[in-house]
Every structure is written in C-alpha cells, then in structure tokens.
Amino acid sequence: MTKFTTEEVRSKFITYFKANNHTHVPASSLIPDNDPSLMFVNSGMVQFKNVFTGQEKRSYNKAVTSQKSLRAGGKHNDLEHVGYTARHHTFFEMLGNFSFGDYFKEQAIYYTWDLLTKEFELPKDKLYVTIYHTDDTAASYWEKISGLRDDRIIKIKTNDNFWSMGDTGPCGPCSEIFYDHGEEIYGGLPGTKDEDCDRFIEIWNMVFMQYEQINKETRIELPKKSIDTGMGLERMTAVLQHVNNNYDIDLFQEIINFTENIVKVKVDGEAKFSYRVIADHLRASSFLIADGIIPSNEGRGYVLRRIMRRAMRHAHMLGAKEPLMYKLLPKLVDLMGNIYPELKIAEGFISSILEQEEIRFKTTLERGLKLLTEETKTLTKGNKLSGEVAFKLYDTYGFPLDLTEDILKNRDIAVDHKGFEELMLIQKERARTSWLGSGESKTDQLWFDIKEQYGSTEFLGYTLNEAKCKIIALIKNNNLADTIQEVDTQFLLIANQTPFYGESGGQMGDIGMIFSQDSEVEVIDTLKYLRSIIVHKCILKKGKINIGENANFNIDIKYRKNLRIHHSATHILHAVLHKILGKQVIQKGSLVTSTYLRFDINHSKAITNEEITLIEDKVNEIIRNNHEVNTTVMFTEDAIKQGAIALFGEKYDSEVRVVKIGETSLELCCGTHVKRTGDIGAFKIISESSIAAGVRRIEAVCGEFVIKLIREKDNLIKLIESSVKTNKNELITKVTNILERNKELEKELEKAHLAGLDLSIEQIKKQAEQIAGIKLLYKKVGNINNKILRQAAENLTQKLENLIVVYIAHGVGKLSITVAVSKAITDKFNAGIIAKELSLFLGGSGGGGKASIAQSGGNDIVNLTNINKKLLSLIVT
C-alpha cells in the first residue's frame, strides 16, 4: 500500500471526481450562511443544503469538495476530547462527492470502491461496509461491485445508518466504509459493544437521500434522489500513512515538530497531549479568524476564545513564557495556505489577533491557576469545585468553564455546574455588561425600579415625528422628582411612549422640543437605558413640568432626516465593503450622527486609495439607483435564515426589525432609515485610519454635507490660487515649485545659522567665561533647529580641549537646550547631566544624551533670567 501525504490524499480525491465530471466547488466559510441552527459548518453538505431541498438551483449536478469543518459548540462539541484521543479534532477537513438528482446508489458505491482500492490501493481484506438493515438494494450493489462476503457487509438497525436533515425534509439510509487496523489493536466490528474502540475505523460515509419526511408518520420517495458523502481527510491520511492516530500524520507532525523547536520540550509523556492540543487549536483558531470571527464573550467569538485559551494554557504547561501561537502561524500557512488562500490573505490579521489574545490572557492565567491550586488543595478525587470559584475564574480571570474542567480532569475533580449557572444568571440579570444599569448602585437600581413599574417605552418614531405622550418619571440629580420648575435646569424625562429615538445600534438619539400646558422643554439628547427605557435628556426653557401630565413631543425633523440618511448609508457601505474587501469583513462598531457617519471594521491593512474610490463609486451607484428601503418585523431566527446580517456582540430579542435595501443589503436594525436610497443624495469618505490592531475606521458624510465638503474644498483651492497667484490648472506645478524653493531657502538658512555660530579659537577665548579652570560659552539664540545647534556646539568643543558650550534657543512658547563638553574634560563635566538640570530648572521634564553632547527642553521663559546663576552652580560644584 503506497504511503500518501495529506496534500496528496486531498488532491487525489478531488482529481478523481473531477475526472468523473464532478465540479470542484471551493470550501465555504466556517460560518454557515444558509442554516441559522448551526454555529459552524460541520460537514461538507452544509453549503449544499438548499440544493438538496430544492430551494436553490446550481449550474452543476455533481460536485466534489474539500470542506473545512469545525465541531466545538452545540451538540457537536468535541473540545474536551481534543488532544487526548486519536481522532477528535475541533477543526478538520471533510472530503466529499455529491450528486443532486444525477447518479445514485450503484454509481456512488462504484466510485467509493474504485477510489479506495485502485487509486488509494487499500487492501480489500482490510475493508468492511455497513448498510441500513432494510436497504437490500445497497447490499446487492456492494456484493456486485466489491465482491465482499456477506460477513463483511454488516446490516445496522439503529439510526446510525439512517440520516435525516430534521423532523421533516430529505432523508435516507447510509452506508459506511470501515478500515481494519489489525488484531493487535483492540476493538470490535460496527454494531458490536466494542465498536467505539480503535481497531475498526470509519473512513467514509455515504448518505442515499431517497425519501422526504413529510411528518412523523409519513415518508415518501423523492422524485430526484441524491448522494451526500463524507470522508475525514485526517482519518484517511492516517490509514494511508500506516498510523493509528491522526496526530501522527505528516501535517500534524510538521506543526508539532515546529512547536518543539521553539519551546524546547521533548514530545513525550504528558507534553505529547499539549503539543496535540496546540496543533489542533492553532488550525481551528486561525481558520475562524480568517473567516471573520474575533475572540469575544458571546456566540462564535466565545467559542474561538475558549479554543484559543485552552491552547494557551497548554503552551503555558510546556513552559512557554512568551506568546506562542502566532509564532506557529507561518508553518500552518505554509502547509495549508495554497489550498485555502484565505489563510494567506488574512495572515497578518490572524497573527495580530493570536498575539493580542495570548498577551491579554497571560496577564491573568498565572493568577487564575494560583487561585485554582489554592481552592483545590483540600479537594480529593471525586469532589467538586464550588460554582463560586469556577465563576470567579470565569468572571475575573477569563477562564472559560471548560478550561477549568480541563485543568481538573486529570485529578478527577468535577465542577459544580448548578452553582456556576446560578451565578451566571445573577450576572445577566444585573446586566453588568451594559453601559448603564448594572444594579450595583443606588442610581442603577433606580432604572431597574422604573422598568419594573412602567415596563418598556413604546417607540412611535418609525411613523410619527410628533405625538401626545404622558410623562411618567422626572429625574433630577439621580433622584425622582414630581415637578421641575427651575428654568435652565437639566433633568431626565421618561414618558409612556415617544417619537424620540433613544441612542442605540450606533445611531445618536433625537433632539427636539416638548410642550406641556405650562412649559417648554428642550430635548438635547435621547438615550436608551436597560435596552428598553427611552430617556429624554432635557433643559427646562419656560414654566414648569409635572409628572403625570400629557405633553406634545416634537422631534427636530431636519436632525432626524440627517440621521436617517447617514444610517441607511452605513448599511449600504457595509454591503459594499463585503463586495470589495471580502466577506470576512465584520462590523466592529459604528456611529451615526446628523453630520457624518463612522464605521469600524476588522481589516488587517489600510484601505488603499483605489479601494476607497471603488467603495465610493459603488455606494453612490446604489444611491442613484434609488432602491426602495423596506422594513419588516419578524422572528430573529427567520430573519437570519433569510440571510439578514446580525452583528456580533449585539443582543437581539425574539422578534427583530429587518431593514432591506433593494437587493443590496439585509440587516437586523432598530434604527431609522430613508424610504429610498435616492434620499441619501451622495456619499463621500472623508477619512480612513487604524484605531487598533486589525481594526480600520471609515468616516464619511452624506447628502448636503457632501455639497458642503465640496464647497469648502473649492473655496480652499480658490484661496490657495489667490495666495500663490495662479489658476487651478497650474496650481500643482506652482505649489511644487514653492515647496522646492522653500527647501532650498531652509538649507541656505541652516548654513547661515551654522556660519553665524561658528567662532575661531581666538573668538571663543574672547567670548567665553573662565570658570574653575574651564571656559564656558553660553549664548541665547533665536528659533534655530536642534540639528544646527548640536552641530555648531560640537564644532566648537573640537577646537578647544577645556570648553563647555551652552545654547538656549527661544522658540514659540518653548525653550531648546543644547550642551556640549570637550571630550578631554568629560571625566569632570557631563553634558547629559547639565542638560537635564537646566531642563528641570526651566520647567522641562529633564533630558539627556552623551557625556560630550546632550539636548533637552523647557518652557519656563520667565526663569530664563536666572539661568546664569544656575549654570555657574552646576559647573563650580
């Protein structure tokens, strides 16, 4: 049997099916875009789910893939086993061939047997197959094609050999192929009590999708039958490399050996498991980040953080003192970057995230481990760690619960899950992660009390700009009030309903006026507390306002219009960024104001001028096309199923508002929007910058503010034209000439300054003061740059062996100090010390340099009159 590399196994599988008229379909993202029930893509068929159900048509009816997959959340959670067993992984590759109404059982079985026995040269006497116990058709095809005896075609009665997509939908019997590693390894045949041991290993699974489940009692034949298969690349490679452990294949061994060369710990004993965990989790972490997931405390981001921190804890166990994971990334990219180019594209970003997360976790890891050691000193085998300690490790030290369990596993100590979950529930109820309303102070408790008494504020502003509302609470200086009657007093106001939008989802709150029978109130901002109470920040302009009275609430219509314009533009921008920069782009934050918008994204490098132009052009094209903007309310699950973008870190209720902009954008959003994209008018990016490692910020203006920007720039150009006496066509040439001439003049000025400071030996002796056996030359000069002063001072100290030169340059609001000492006397006088003391004397922060030359600064110009006395004291002492 030929020995194949991992790359050769993958390549041969794909090549075989391409030769048999299958279309090679690239792997989809690990983030499913067609199945909200899945946290991650966990098999090859996920990207074809809608094809199997008939909801989607493609240009091909046969496909082959190598699909990146991940099992580390939900019911497919293999995390705790990874590294300790032979075949558990978080990240793995699933090879698969698929037929959508084309070939069926006979051809599928033929392809499988032909590829395994001829292309991969597996011995026939090493192979067993299983079928569903009623699938006589599959049994007859296996006998016909493979020639296997009846005892090697095993009928299974359980649902292990019958697959379904859910309670309803396509389903069908399965057939699995097993490889026998030999009698020297313990294990039983499929269907026996020892089937889960390591002798007989499943290497390929075929699903014969021939039925549709209508309901619990009814199942009918599908008119077009399909094939879905899956072969674990790592398992198959282990078989073809004659090893019984996936971590012994070439791909993992390369990563493990690379890691060993860095940490210098031998791969054996307990360390062996740590190396395996790191190798597996490096792959999972890197591919998740490449697909746009960032470590966080919720959802997919939290699964990523758990994986990363588990690997980092094992790196710590190997004695790694510095961040390790990012140093291993180049090896992974080298091994897998060709088949998965997203790794190469995102390498810099992945490296940055890996390093940042490890640095962040290392600061608390050792303290958390110390706490865990202290708390488990008295615990013995079979005991439980208290939920309180587990929660403290989670909340204070960033230990995911499964990391704590992983650490305690070898000591057979469990964790009190119930106690942990109770404390988690208390934390959520207190909303500690909210920017307001943690329940931990009197003020915060006030908001909980208001919410408990009055419930959520009804928002009317999607359809109304003004409304009559009842005032239910007035708050002044963090205390409830019955009446506000001091004019110009600032206070908070809550009503039963309001057309004012409370700041949320990145959109600023509304401003406007409230009129009651006896008062006029200016609303200077509108906020949202505890995600549901709309709070008006007000100033009393006239009269008095009372709790319980009705008032007319009027938003500033123009202000709201500009908010709508900029908010809708952020949705369009988001969609365009996906098209131009890639679908891995994730919104990290946004701010929608009435005058501009701000949009933060994960992106590892600066957005080029060419890309900015493309983005602007595409956004403006969508604006000009005047697409309709529709909003609907639906269940969150249904919205996501339809492809609506849900932002990571955002919390959503069971029902959400979905904003659809033509065929361009579909997002969950509670904000206010234009009716048609043409209402936006125009879009212009005004800045692009980095605000953190791997995060870029785009700022832009829309509508009338684009016109204003153009007018300002046009006026600026006209002013420059007038100043330099030229026209627009000659402006660049004229300015370039001026700048070049300015450089020449600066050089001439520097030469003049240097010449003016140069003195002959006789002039030095004449101008310098004789003190304590040395000569001191002190001069106050104008605003001359430090480079010239340094050069001039050094030139003079080279002419005399016992000279100290001190220049103090007086610039605009600051002083520059230069001190030079002849090298012959640096054993007695240190320029660095003198410069530092002078700086402190003149209000600076000190400075320094070498013994022979130093520079510093100050800003106490008044004290400059006493500098002579200070200089003398420094030299005489």
From Swiss-Prot:
Its cofactor is Zn(2+). Binds 1 zinc ion per subunit. It is found in: Cytoplasm. GO terms for biological process: alanyl-tRNA aminoacylation; negative regulation of DNA-templated transcription. Keywords: Aminoacyl-tRNA synthetase, ATP-binding, Cytoplasm, Ligase, Metal-binding, Nucleotide-binding, Protein biosynthesis, RNA-binding, tRNA-binding, Zinc. It comes from the Bacteria. Catalyzes the attachment of alanine to tRNA(Ala) in a two-step reaction: alanine is first activated by ATP to form Ala-AMP and then transferred to the acceptor end of tRNA(Ala). Also edits incorrectly charged Ser-tRNA(Ala) and Gly-tRNA(Ala) via its editing domain. Consists of three domains; the N-terminal catalytic domain, the editing domain and the C-terminal C-Ala domain. The editing domain removes incorrectly charged amino acids, while the C-Ala domain, along with tRNA(Ala), serves as a bridge to cooperatively bring together the editing and aminoacylation centers thus stimulating deacylation of misacylated tRNAs. This is Alanine--tRNA ligase. It comes from Rickettsia typhi (strain ATCC VR-144 / Wilmington).
